Amino acid sequence: MPFTFQIGNHSCQISERYLRDIIDNKREHVFSTCEKFIDFFRNIFTRRSLISDYREIYNLLCQKKEHPDIKGPFSPGPFSKRDEDCTRWRPLLGYIKLIDASRPETIDKYTVEVLAHQENMLLLQMFYDGVLVTETECSERCVDFLKETMFNYNNGEITLAALGNDNLPPSEAGSNGIYEAFEQRLIDFLTTPATASGYESGAIDQTDASQPAAIEAFINSPEFQKNIRMRDIEKNKIGSGSYGTVYRLHDDFVVKIPVNERGIKVDVNSPEHRNCHPDRVSKYLNMANDDKNFSRSAIMNINGKDVTVLVSKYIQGQEFDVEDEDNYRMAEALLKSRGVYMHDINILGNILVKEGVLFFVDGDQIVLSQESRQQRSVSLATRQLEEQIKAHHMIKLKRAETEGNTEDVEYYKSLITDLDALIGEEEQTPAPGRRFKLAAPEEGTLVAKVLKDELKK
């Protein structure tokens, strides 16, 4: 079924398959000789060219997609002053260019939806007449900017305005003035340093330093950019766990590669392990350590393949004794003051101490604190992580009740109570005559998988 976009004084049609190819970031479709032949006669008899329509829509949505920088109509200037990924903006800019080229009476067919994606990262989906046109990842700070300039967050309606004249007549494609107005506001936004610290910084606006930090210099160095062979760095291994293995590849920095202690690759995009995605972990490590340059997510070429890894500062300190109650409370209070909470704070080695200063070196299970959650909602990655943690606690509680281990029963009850308080759930009172009731999870859900894995042990 073809979709029709009202562009300027004419309409453009594109098939669902070709539109899907554009959305999925495939290359521009190369029309065959037969398709060109048919389109030639279509143009003679109907004055329509589907090939021309396709190219017009493609060029609006995919501006200079083959180039690493946006060359126009959007200037790459703002990206040179900040650590910005212009590829995240490209789908959005193409979508707004498409709106700008459309007839004013059809603009109400364009809508936007915002979905939870990764921690502090949202997925912006852009539609035309209910059909998904394009999508892109966006930081929460950038979404706040778009809510002010582009769309109504409550209903998804487009609120873009033309530059200086909302009633500019559309005689030619792109003459509405909408894109030009948005471009000016976007440049102002990108060239204004992010005043927020900690969790308000996102993947698009990670740092505003005019000079690259030492960690950035390391990531951009030939030492990091070269092809790394695992067998060559095995001697630099300093630890491993469920989410990855850490190697010291520099005097000042370590790299965490998503291969666990059993040598199995960890899929950081899966529901089970989304919480350990380097983008997310880096944000929380920076928050926990109150240091925006403590860590970074980066791409490393390992055995000839690009792999997303976590780069963080190397701390030559001692393991902090969290078994000491005073130490435990001190670390907990420090995290709370920085707006975060650490689910695995009790694990020895996750916190180091150097010259009296605490360093949090494992961020896979760091989440927003209870106070921070009053200001903003958590992401899908955090919700899935805490579902797994609660399922684990409930299994342990069930076993303790079955074995009559009173001490463990009280311990796991307290953990569940604390978790419920953190995520804002009310404690469920057990039914009369039953001390514990575990509702059967829906088959195929993440919790069901966790329960099955636990019961196999």
UniProtKB/Swiss-Prot annotation:
Autophosphorylated. GO terms for cellular component: extracellular region; host cell; host cell cytoplasm. Its EC number is 2.7.-.-. One of its GO terms (molecular function) is kinase activity. The keyword Transferase applies. Keywords: ATP-binding, Host cytoplasm, Kinase, Nucleotide-binding, Secreted, Transferase, Virulence. Induction: Expression is regulated by the two-component regulatory system SsrA/SsrB. Highly expressed in host macrophages and when grown in an acidic environment. GO terms for biological process: protein autophosphorylation; protein secretion by the type III secretion system. It is an enzyme of class 2 (transferase). ATP binds at K256. Transmembrane segments: none annotated. It is found in: Secreted; Host cytoplasm. Belongs to the protein kinase superfamily. Effector proteins function to alter host cell physiology and promote bacterial survival in host tissues. This protein is a kinase, which is required for SPI-2 T3SS-dependent F-actin meshwork formation in infected host cells. This is Secreted effector kinase SteC. The gene is steC.
